[in-house]
Amino acid sequence: GADIIDIGAESARTNREAISIDEEISRLRSFIEQWHTIRDLEPKDKEQLSPPLLSVNTWRPEVVEQILGPEVDLLNDMSALPDNRNALLCAKHQTSLLIMHSVGQPKIPHTHQQWRGLMKSMADFFEEKTAIAIEAGLSREQIILDPGLDFAKQKEDNLLLLRELNQLIHLGFPLLLPISRKTVIGEALDIEDPRKRDAGTLALLAHGVHKGAHLFRVHNTETCWQALKVLSAL
């Protein structure tokens, strides 16, 4: 099963309508309150697994300020950390922070972004953003990096960063690889329906393990768990 459950109230897709701050807060609070109740239940036996950690996918500081608390273990911030506000809030609540690589504000298409030296740009980006997070009061152990597959990147950009993942691993922070059913898989396989990209997802899972990634964001947890189990036995 999953070690972390990642929830969000607003789709990251640029072709989906944005929701208001109040609506996002309301949706997230409703889930977090129910999650808190479930997580506090005593296990029926000693062998029962502990409940997964909770990650909340949001980026607007006005929302983050209202939903962070002891029930939230990780803030999945897709804003590329343009300032220190979300980092300060995470430090205040001792919540881990996931920093995603991208450009510009979320929900705005960046389909024509051109990169010169993508991996160097990403390394410089993460060095700058992790410095902001550490200065805000977070420890290195509380920071996770996300290369932002498909975000402000073309097919060849995505393939390059997947081939050169070791350059991000060497930065010394845990790396999350969001591989599940991604557009780059559909482009490689010529498959438009994301639900039919699970085989490609497993290929990227095995590749990510080989490269040294620490965490993987997936939809089909059972299939991916089985693949990881076999890989770990080899």
PLM feature spans:
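Phosphate/pyrophosphate-binding loops at sites that engage ATP/ADP/AMP, CoA/4′-phosphopantetheine
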Residues: 36-42, 129-142
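Active-site-adjacent loop and "lid" segments of alpha/beta metabolic enzymes
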Residues: 12-38, 47-54, 59-61, 68-70, ...
